[in-house]
Regions:
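An N-terminal, well-structured beta->alpha segment
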Residues: 22-95, 101-102, 177-209
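Gly/Ser/Thr-rich active-site loops/lids in small-molecule metabolic enzymes
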Residues: 235, 239-241, 292-310, 376-392
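Gly/Ser/Thr-enriched, mixed-charge loops and adjacent short helices
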Residues: 26-35, 46, 141-266
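N-terminal small/polar loop signature for handling phosphorylated ligands or for N-terminal nucleophile
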Residues: 71-72, 77-140, 227-289, 346
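Short glycine-rich phosphate-binding loop at a beta-alpha junction
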Residues: 73-83, 107, 212-215, 311-315, ...
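Phosphate-binding and adjacent anionic-ligand microenvironments
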Residues: 271-273, 309-484, 488-492, 498-518
Length: 518
């Protein structure tokens, strides 16, 4: 992705051969035809479905939508970046072409964490486009869009779906691939540098002095940057597990080999903690001194505690220890997905909350208001972030003279376990949820008990905020939810012991697997 955008590709309407014919596509129709669907803050799909034409059209629709709501006015800059997937570079070229053809300049921030690009957009007051598939398999990818003030929300997504975009028919071949050469500008490090300074300036040099931290890099786009930031903060940093091949690390469904590696590394190197992220480095992983990975929602509670939040916004799927801890004045529950968490944070700010934060079950942490700590200001970053979670938990342990395992043990002992069934048809999972949640509470309780009572007893409560969340009379919880951006069926389980939560999850996964066929 070196060099300048080719002059021959600047005009969307003419080439040397003469006048081009136009093609118009409606985004909502393209979604169905291409199988590339909108999920959280953008689009995701199989790489084979995300041809250049689809990626171009979606990005053009994003630009047009921003023009329609007055955020763009025919010229200016849009920052772009990407993760380390092999398909990312090609998709970034299609994104850059769409931006140029709409009269704007793509500013290439290179490969960097999603929150680093979003933060740069907030600082520069420009929209951003991040090419990333996050944690999903390498045969898939995605495009995540943010406005000048942060992530696109659900109403923005609806506005983008309503767009129609027009472009030269000859711009793409019969396979939907670009017929012109596109080279975005040479990448710069300004966004990465700003993200590094964000944490070093706030937390201070040498705040982690004396701590030995392992960094599980794998193929995370922020793997090297994590080492740099923690080193600047004074930690003794040990890079671990770097991979040239992309590894789809899911912070909610850890691979068995990553669980084993965490414990092995902690023992071998005597680490105080091991940290990592998913592929685009917006979802954290952090272990205790024994190499046991903390659940994302548990890490979120500890991070919110460090920042002294008075309002915590979190999806309905997250551990109820946040309420049971009594640490926070208000806990707001939302649907699953960062746009819903952001909307909840915006509401809390409008109601006058002092310090508003949010987190998800995947560990992604969102800061909804500026944080003042010892006279240093950490600016709001209302998008998922990972590095701040690592540092906050490490410093909380230092301040309280505790090991990370001890911090976790001091919270209410509620354990959550989640897993997913891959290649589970979305229409089938949604149909099964609909069978058990008709809106008639008595009828639904009986239907649920017919399936689950032999294992969990009577139903005490049903929550359909997002999927189907069932609380049983023994205070055990199961939450069944189709994924919003992949053919996956997730199950979250919560109980008073880790073994029981694992047992519940295993039972539910077995039941759900039998639902694949009508």
């Amino acid at each position: 992705m070196k060099g300048e955008v080719k002059a021959s590709s600047l005009s969307p309407w003419r080439r040397e051969s003469g006048l081009m014919t136009k093609k118009t596509v409606w985004i909502e129709n393209l979604m169905g035809k291409s199988n590339v669907q909108f999920g959280t803050s953008g689009a995701r799909g199989l790489v084979s479905d995300m041809n250049d034409e689809v990626c171009y059209a979606y990005t053009a629709a994003f630009v047009q939508y921003l023009e329609g709501v007055g955020e763009l006015s025919g010229n200016g800059t849009i920052a772009i970046g990407g993760d380390l997937r092999p398909s990312t570079d090609r998709i970034m070229r299609a994104v850059a072409k769409a931006i140029v053809d709409r009269g704007y300049t793509p500013e290439n921030c290179g490969t960097l964490p999603t929150p680093a690009l979003a933060y740069y957009g907030l600082l520069q007051k420009v929209p951003t486009v991040m090419v990333t598939g996050s944690h999903i398999p390498v045969d898939r990818n995605g495009i995540k869009y943010t406005k000048k003030e942060g992530e696109i929300l659900k109403h923005d997504e609806a506005g983008m779906k309503c767009q129609s975009v027009t472009f030269p028919r000859e711009l793409f071949d019969e396979k939907g691939m670009l017929t012109v050469e596109v080279e975005p500008p040479f990448p710069h490090n300004s966004a990465i540098d700003a993200y590094r300074r964000r944490y070093v300036d706030f937390f201070g040099n040498n705040c982690l002095s004396g701590k030995k931290i392992g960094v599980y890099q794998h193929s995370a786009v922020g793997g090297k940057l994590m080492v740099t930031i923690l080193s600047h903060l004074g930690a003794d940093v040990i890079p671990l597990g770097f991979s040239e091949t992309f590894i789809p690390v899911d912070t909610e469904a850890m691979r068995p080999e990553d669980i084993v590696s965490g414990r092995m590394w902690a023992d071998e190197y005597a680490c105080d903690a091991i940290v990592s992220t998913d592929g685009d480095s917006d979802r954290p992983l952090i272990s205790d001194e024994r190499g046991r990975w903390l659940r994302g929602d548990l890490a979120g509670i500890l991070c919110a505690d460090y920042f002294d939040a008075d309002v915590v916004v979190t999806p309905v799927s997250c551990n109820t220890a946040v309420e049971k801890s009594g640490l926070f004045k208000t806990v707001i529950r939302t649907k699953i997905g960062s746009p819903f968490v952001i909307e909840g944070m915006q509401h809390a700010r409008a109601m006058g909350a002092r310090c508003v934060v949010g987190y998800e079950a995947n560990g992604g942490f969102l800061i909804g208001s500026d944080i003042d700590r010892n006279g240093n200001i950490l600016k709001a970053l209302p998008t998922r972030d990972a590095v701040g979670v690592h540092i906050a938990i490490l410093l909380l342990a230092i301040e309280r003279k505790r090991k990370i395992s001890e911090l976790a043990a001091e919270l209410p002992q509620r354990y959550t376990v989640s897993n997913r069934l891959k290649n589970f048809p979305t229409e089938r999972s949604m149909a099964k949820i609909a069978e058990l949640s008709t809106g008639d509470e008595g009828k639904d309780a009986k239907a649920i008990e017919a399936v689950f009572s032999a294992y969990f007893g009577k139903v005490a409560g049903i929550n359909t905020t997002d999927g189907l969340r069932i609380t049983f009379s023994n205070d055990e919880i199961i939450h069944l939810r189709p994924s919003g951006n992949a053919p996956e069926f997730r199950c979250y389980a919560e109980a008073d012991t880790e073994n029981r939560a694992e047992e519940i999850n295993k039972i539910c996964m077995g039941i759900m697997d039998k639902w694949r066929q009508p």
